[in-house]
Amino acid sequence: MSETCGGNCSSCSEACSERKPESLQAQPNPKSKIGKVIAVVSGKGGVGKSTVSAMLATAMQRTGRRAGVLDADITGPSIPKAFGVSECASADEEGIYPAVTESGIQIMSVNLLLEHEDDPVLWRGPIIAGAVEQFWTDVIWDNVDY
């Protein structure tokens, strides 16, 4: 640490050992209990990300693990339909509660928040990113292993 250090690393250009990098990772809702996260991603649409996610969650659930699926496909959500879920997610002052499938898989998708599940969502860029982040920060995932 420099002799002139005032302890304010955000305005300092020195690379001292006291500097701790700021995490850019959004923290989940404090009431959530989440084990590990498996991301199923691709830059291309229509390659089976939702199908793989649904099958992976089902396989986890069948082996005794508790699973949840965060459907980040805001403009074309299909996870609720894959699981046959049509009821809306619920919310209170503490957060949003995901819908639960017949087999106990917790799911969160934008169409679980719409009045009509097939209403189009015409969002772009930062608004989509904000919605996905809210699914992580505002949803209360109840003791999921994956």
Region locations from a protein language model:
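Phosphate-binding loop that captures ATP/GTP phosphates
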Residues: 66-67, 72-118, 122-123, 129
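Alpha-helical scaffold segments in soluble metabolic enzymes
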Residues: 55, 59, 78-81, 130-135
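Walker A/P-loop phosphate-binding motif and the immediately C-terminal alpha-helix
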Residues: 36-74
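N-terminal, positively charged regions that mediate nucleic acid binding
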Residues: 2, 12, 51, 63, ...
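Extreme N-terminal, non-catalytic leader segments
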Residues: 1-44, 66
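Solvent-exposed alpha-helices and their adjacent loops that cap or buttress functional pockets
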Residues: 30-33, 89, 97-102, 139-142
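Conserved, well-folded catalytic cores of nucleic-acid-processing
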Residues: 15, 63, 82-86, 134-142
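Phosphate/Mg2+-binding loops and adjacent switch elements
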Residues: 121-146
